[in-house]
């Protein structure tokens, strides 16, 4: 098979390559006829012959090469030596001596090598004895096998016996050990495995990691229940907490699909709590050609679940766990397109470490409809929505929105003009709450805006390179009369962050409870650098500002305030490639009245080739939301963060990975990640060792160490950190997919 050395050389593959098959080159024979060719052939036809010197025996799809062969034609049996090679439908058997029946494909050989390839998966083995029990059926005695390149035995399965069936694609090993670098690392008395990469029920390789909670071990078992149905059972243990049981079921039908996933810990020794769990259910269903629906349900046992069992990104993104039932409908009606939706949604909101939470309203239900039709240059749009809002500790109510509008599109080669006019009508039916009695209120506002832009092009030369450069000035006028909205509730509305795209929105708010007043003009311009050959965008930069013709402004609480000046702050950006290997980006929100930046972020990434990336990012915000306080309001403060990340080869096939995310204002690291990855020269295995320390709350941190050993076409040992590295390091590449010279 080759050396057990972990650091395979390509020369070893050449020296141990699969034996080549010599064919006669003559016309194919009829079915079940046998051809014998050699330097010397003697014997009696139709009885027995002996062939010596470069023997070639062909029958059906099989070819046998040998130094000599005795062929008994009465029984269709061949004895061959001193060396032989037998080719059978993608498999090659080679060794010293062979006894083989050409008719029923049975026989045996000692000190034999078997090479097979099917559906892109390669297997190689060396055995004391091989028994051929029919077409595609083998039994290997005292054998070693792996899926590596010829000559690479950096890892292999050593077994007392292995039986393989090429037809079913299943192999069964008995008394088997996984040997890595010459050292046995796993043992099983019995195991079955797929030969062709197809799914099959059986034990999966254990996952292993360590960290603040001690050693974490899981022993998953996979159930291939049907071609469209499978399940995984994940029993495991966390040393400082206890036993954890998990599982997943996946199903797929032509009209629907879904995933059910869950974990359960009967008793958490560290928290001194019982029955800690999580449930995830996602179902999508195409009911008819026009009607689809689905369910998304998430639940955990307690507020600390994600902080205890997940990483920093999951903690931040799982504060409001979604529970939603939805139906979508689409059709052509009255010569236009209609889209409708019905939603029922309620969140499980998790409290922060101080026990505070800001729970959104439940939607019980929401019915939305939108009809659009184009007549000439006019696009007619009618939006309608009814929502019933329910909350345990706030005023309930329903909201009905009707927003018909018409937009005209006038386009030509130099630019466009798009005027739009509409009427936004909102009606509320509010229930009684505390000392407040039930009431009905409404708001009707006309909306008018004009969006216009131009595009100029020129050939440009920058640092000796030719580009097609555009200059794209844009004006956006928006008018909405001022109307106090402090008598209206705020069910689901928030303010958009101020950005370049925000300059061209008619409403500063997300949601229908607040509509800003407007009599403003946005003036902006952007430039793009394009590849003159294919038009691909390489770089884009822009800057813009809004000018107010009236100072009235509707605030988030519904009251009418006033802008302090007649123009907004500046916003600008620049993103793109500075060269083939350097990508940079910059975004800024600048207050020219105070001569200060309200926020900005600068990013640069050097990525000359896969597996080589260095990135740096600096982020500043003068008044950013930090955390929820006991009074239900958020605490705002300045943030200054630096984020450094890298993946880089430090020697051939050995890569270092790292990330350092530091909050300068709070004087504490948010995340530290450091590790190393290695892939073998012949590509048969790769390994990762990654350590991570990250923030889980205002005053809490967690540590984790992940080790992963990936064996080609077999499985992963340990806990694969790929997803964590992909999120932590912009431009990260899987080490085992990096091609090195």
Q: Residue locations for each model-derived region?
A:
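N-terminal amphipathic/hydrophobic interface segments
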Residues: 1-142, 156-175, 233
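Outer-membrane beta-barrel proteins and related beta-barrel translocases across Gram-negative bacteria
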Residues: 91-146, 150-161, 165-741
């Amino acid at each position: 098979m080759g050396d057990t050395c972990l650091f395979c050389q390509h020369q070893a593959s050449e020296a141990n390559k699969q034996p080549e098959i010599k064919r006669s080159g003559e016309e194919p024979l009829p079915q079940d006829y046998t051809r014998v060719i050699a330097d010397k052939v003697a014997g009696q036809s139709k009885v027995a012959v002996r062939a010596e010197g470069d023997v070639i025996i062909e029958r059906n799809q099989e070819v046998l090469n040998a130094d000599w062969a005795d062929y008994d034609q009465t029984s269709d049996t061949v004895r061959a030596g001193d060396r032989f090679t037998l080719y059978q439908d993608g498999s090659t058997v080679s060794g010293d001596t062979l006894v083989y029946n050409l008719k029923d494909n049975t026989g045996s050989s000692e000190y034999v090598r078997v090479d097979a390839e099917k559906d892109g998966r390669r297997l190689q083995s060396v055995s004391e004895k091989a028994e051929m029990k029919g077409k595609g059926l083998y039994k290997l005695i005292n054998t070693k096998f792996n899926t590596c390149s010829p000559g690479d035995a950096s890892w292999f399965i050593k077994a007392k016996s292995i039986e393989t069936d090429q037809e079913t694609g299943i192999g069964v090993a008995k008394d088997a050990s996984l040997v890595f670098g010459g050292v046995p690392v796993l043992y099983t008395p019995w195991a079955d495995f797929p030969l062709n990469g197809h799914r099959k029920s059986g034990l999966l390789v254990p996952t292993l990691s360590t960290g603040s909670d001690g050693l974490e071990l899981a022993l998953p078992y996979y159930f291939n229940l049907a071609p469209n149905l499978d399940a995984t059972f994940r029993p495991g243990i966390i040393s400082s907490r206890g036993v954890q049981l998990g599982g997943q079921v996946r199903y797929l039908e032509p009209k629907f699909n879904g995933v059910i996933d869950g974990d359960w810990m009967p008793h958490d020794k560290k928290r001194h709590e019982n029955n800690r769990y999580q449930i995830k259910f996602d179902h999508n269903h195409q009911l008819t050609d026009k009607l689809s629906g689905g369910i998304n349900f998430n639940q955990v046992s307690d507020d600390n679940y994600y902080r205890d069992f997940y990483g920093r990104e999951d903690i931040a993104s799982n504060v409001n766990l979604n529970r939603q039932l939805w139906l979508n409908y689409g059709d052509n009606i009255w010569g236009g397109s209609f889209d409708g939706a019905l939603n029922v949604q309620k969140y499980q909101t998790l409290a922060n470490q101080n026990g505070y939470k800001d729970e959104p309203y439940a939607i019980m239900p929401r019915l939305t409809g939108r009809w659009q039709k184009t007549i000439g240059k006019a696009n007619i749009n009618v939006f309608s929505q009814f929502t019933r809002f329910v909350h345990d500790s706030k005023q309930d109510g329903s909201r009905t929105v009707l927003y018909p509008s018409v937009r005209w599109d006038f386009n030509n080669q130099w630019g466009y003009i798009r005027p739009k006019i509409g009427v936004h009508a909102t009606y509320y039916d509010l229930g009684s709450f505390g000392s407040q009695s039930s009431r009905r209120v409404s708001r009707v506002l006309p909306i008018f805006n004009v969006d216009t832009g131009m595009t100029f092009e020129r050939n440009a030369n920058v640092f000796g390179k030719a580009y097609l450069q555009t200059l794209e000035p844009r004006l956006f006028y928006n008018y909405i009369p001022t109307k106090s909205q402090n008598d209206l509730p705020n069910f689901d509305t928030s303010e958009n962050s101020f950005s370049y795209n925000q300059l061209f929105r008619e409403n500063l708010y997300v949601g229908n409870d607040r509509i800003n007043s407007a009599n403003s003009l946005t003036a902006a311009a952007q430039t793009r650098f394009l590849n003159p050959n294919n038009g691909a965008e390489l770089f884009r930069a822009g800057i813009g500002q809004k000018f107010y013709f009236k100072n009235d402004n509707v605030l988030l609480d519904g009251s009418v305030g006033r802008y302090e000046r007649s123009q907004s702050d500046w916003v600008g950006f620049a993103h793109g490639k500075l060269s083939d290997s350097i990508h940079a980006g910059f975004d800024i929100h600048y207050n020219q009245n105070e001569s200060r930046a309200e926020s900005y972020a600068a990013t640069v990434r050097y990525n000359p080739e896969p597996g080589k990336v260095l990135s740096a990012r600096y982020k500043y915000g003068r008044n950013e939301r930090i955390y929820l306080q006991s009074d239900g309001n958020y605490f705002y403060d300045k943030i200054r963060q630096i984020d450094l990340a890298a993946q880089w080869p430090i020697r051939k096939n050995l890569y270092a990975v790292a990330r350092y995310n530091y909050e300068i204002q709070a004087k504490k690291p948010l995340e530290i990640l450091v590790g190393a990855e290695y892939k073998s020269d012949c590509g048969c295995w790769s390994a990762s060792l990654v350590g991570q320390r990250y923030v889980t709350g205002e005053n809490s941190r967690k540590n984790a160490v992940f080790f992963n050993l990936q064996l080609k076409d077999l499985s992963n040992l340990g806990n694969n950190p790929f997803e964590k590295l992909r999120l932590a390091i912009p431009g990260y590449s899987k080490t085992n997919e990096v091609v090195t010279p």
